[in-house]
Amino acid sequence: MTNKDARTPASSQTGEALASPQGDQEAGKSIGWHKAYVAGSRPDLRVPVRQVHLTNGESVTLYDTSGPYTDPSVDTDVRRGLAPLRENWIIARGDTEEYAGRPVRPEDDGIKHTSPRGGLRNLDAVFPGRPRQPRRGRDGQAVTQLAYARRGEITPEMEFVAVRENVSAEVVREEIAAGRAVMPVNVNHPEIEPMIIGKRFLVKVNANIGNSAVTSSIEEEVEKMTWATRWGADTVMDLSTGRNIHTTREWVLRNSPVPIGTVPLYQALEKVDGRAEELTWEIYKDTVIEQAEQGVDYMTVHAGVRLPYVPLTANRKTGIVSRGGSIMAAWCLAHHKESFLYENFEELCEILAAYDVTYSLGDGLRPGSIADANDEAQFAELRTLGELNRIAKRFNVQTMIEGPGHVPMHKIKENIDLQQEICDEAPFYTLGPLTTDVAPAYDHITSGIGAAMIAWWGTAMLCYVTPKEHLGLPNRDDVKTGVITYKIAAHAADLAKGHPGAQEWDDALSDARFEFRWEDQFNLALDPDTAREFHDETLPAEPAKTAHFCSMCGPKFCSMKISQDIRREHGGTRTEVEEGMAQKSKEFAAAGNRVYLPLAD
């Protein structure tokens, strides 16, 4: 894990400044960037930021999701895991207890009792970090940030995200208490750097990782997680469906500085050899507890896929495209019974409240093609999600709502408007949406368009789409492309919404561009490495980093250089400009106020 891999230029190119351990750091003013920390009200509350030092002596502070991996003063080791940042905060509240937990079974990793344990691949399989017992609320208490917020308490986690978001801690508490924002922070994931999801805050981006029966290993998934967070992923979902699901998840959680989400239904299905009709509430419940004990911060639950809604998909062009949705539809039809997730939802609420696991209520009937957008099945499920959201709130469980999908541009706004109305403004978490179906290999672009639009109108978190969508499992480069694409969409929405400080980043880069400060442009970019690479393809020499032109227009046709020349030759102070205008007015009057003057002989 080197700094060269970070969401920042390599240190050898920028003269990277090391971060000091003090709050609100200004350590190391060399040009480039360094990891810094803004101090809170207590010694153990230090909020990470990326500070970019510019060649003009100014600096820009940016939101940072990369965790300790980009702090050269921290010795990270994936076999040891990250330091438990929140552990003392959790213990100090006095409302949780450690307990033995459920035993880890072979089937948790998709292995039969008769199978050898040797199916685990890479990283020596079982996580070797410090032994830990799971923690849960005492005596059935809800130990959720929602419960605290409703009691008027401002937790250290709330203060942490307030500093990150450049808002007051009271705003954070109010939004969580109202159900308009969630903070996924399982008590068993103390390594997390708290973040918040809600329409009053910065638009967040989720990256998906996960193995499958066809490809990938534990080591690859851990590396994908750290890679995604370095490029700006605010949360990561582990959607593993192959072997080693439990073990992969343990490695990911112990090394993740961001919230980790899952779809418990996938692992439950593995436990019954992929036969949906053999699923039971007991198997699903056990899987949820297993994942909650490990520290999963939010879970997608497809409780809105009900038996009466399945026939509504019969005339669709692409039917049910959600994996979780199709599993639950198959179960409902096999038993001709109501969904066990819907019928046992209140018991599920009690479980999640004991660990502070956030609901991500799944859109199992989302449209999988433009033709199916905004149909009866989609909105029937949405109405049920609104009902379930209100039940979850009774149990003090934080809740967000998942959304589509494939939606043409003219139908996007209806989705966010209905969701906000039906679900009492609970945070909306959408997959894109994809605005056209004609671009396999470019669906990060088709969906990025929809993502920017729906985030502008109020979606709180965007689930990224990579170039491999509909084609295969994304690799490392695909993950980076997906994250960068969606960070662009999210930031564009932050600008449109007028989020505090959002435009400062753009203004800093615009100034650097106009003043031909190439290194500053690279260092301020979402993807500094690619920006530098593209520039150097045509102007690789070091003096080109100070040239007042690039290879697109050359020195004679650069519009910004011409603009600078005009300012230099004809510009001046505002007073000088106004005096010049007044003089021209007098000359016009002296000429008889004539618009057209006679031609000279």
From Swiss-Prot:
Disulfide bonds: none
Cofactor(s) required for function per UniProt: [4Fe-4S] cluster
Pathway: Cofactor biosynthesis; thiamine diphosphate biosynthesis
Positions annotated to bind Zn(2+): 406, 470
Record keyword Lipid biosynthesis present: no
Pfam families tied to this protein: ThiC-associated, ThiC_Rad_SAM
Catalytic activity: 5-amino-1-(5-phospho-beta-D-ribosyl)imidazole + S-adenosyl-L-methionine = 4-amino-2-methyl-5-(phosphooxymethyl)pyrimidine + CO + 5'-deoxyadenosine + formate + L-methionine + 3 H(+)
EC number: 4.1.99.17
Protein name listed in UniProt: Phosphomethylpyrimidine synthase
Organism: Streptomyces avermitilis (strain ATCC 31267 / DSM 46492 / JCM 5070 / NBRC 14893 / NCIMB 12804 / NRRL 8165 / MA-4680)
